């Protein structure tokens, strides 16, 4: 269901106009991006998502809806409704753990995603990193950040190993263990890109866990494990800068201390690695 109303509505207006029998239940706790709430009617639940990023064009939010509309139920919740500024998606009943699932299970899930038809829009990290630099708190801009940004822009993004649809925000809180298996939620950063970029961006605990995931994926995809790991390492500097920039970006938007702590820790990691 899609509305043609071009004016963003409040949550109460959305409920009264399109979901009159539903009432707010609890805020969605998964992920760091916010902008979600759960609405309920009797035992039936729906996730209502708001376009919460004032610096992102409306087209990005529409892409999120299109990605969910395109993906099979074996990967993601169904898209139920869209109007400018809001969408409603299926609520997935299941268990959410902060830890990632077993490497073989996660590799199979990501390989299943990467076998799907492409979304139709490419993930471009260089302009995104530049946006984070320009939109962050000016007091947080450092010569170190600028040098790293210019070096990446000079080198250019790695040549893709394989192009596929990517989720690009894979961590424990975005994976639901349902009665039918693992599903991914929070697809707002989805787009087409290198499979190794997806693997580089997974929020792993350490290099050992990262290598286990890479080896398991290589077995699924019948790719040489050493070649895949080399490609993941090529993307690693981009991913670390992406995370640092996103934390800075969200700090400027929200003022929430968790983002500045995460940004500081990520910058420390970058400085230690030179």
Curated annotation (Swiss-Prot):
<dbReference type="InterPro" id="IPR014093">
    <property type="entry name" value="Thiamine_kinase"/>
</dbReference>
<dbReference type="InterPro" id="IPR011009">
    <property type="entry name" value="Kinase-like_dom_sf"/>
</dbReference>
<keyword id="KW-0067">ATP-binding</keyword>
<keyword id="KW-0418">Kinase</keyword>
<dbReference type="InterPro" id="IPR002575">
    <property type="entry name" value="Aminoglycoside_PTrfase"/>
</dbReference>
<dbReference type="GO" id="GO:0005524">
    <property type="term" value="F:ATP binding"/>
</dbReference>
<dbReference type="GO" id="GO:0006772">
    <property type="term" value="P:thiamine metabolic process"/>
</dbReference>
<comment type="function">
    <text>Catalyzes the ATP-dependent phosphorylation of thiamine to thiamine phosphate. Is involved in thiamine salvage.</text>
</comment>
<comment type="pathway">
    <text>Cofactor biosynthesis; thiamine diphosphate biosynthesis; thiamine phosphate from thiamine: step 1/1.</text>
</comment>
<dbReference type="GO" id="GO:0009229">
    <property type="term" value="P:thiamine diphosphate biosynthetic process"/>
</dbReference>
<protein>
    <recommendedName>
        <fullName>Thiamine kinase</fullName>
        <ecNumber>2.7.1.89</ecNumber>
    </recommendedName>
</protein>
<dbReference type="GO" id="GO:0019165">
    <property type="term" value="F:thiamine kinase activity"/>
</dbReference>
<dbReference type="Pfam" id="PF01636">
    <property type="entry name" value="APH"/>
</dbReference>
<comment type="similarity">
    <text>Belongs to the thiamine kinase family.</text>
</comment>
<keyword id="KW-0808">Transferase</keyword>
<keyword id="KW-0547">Nucleotide-binding</keyword>
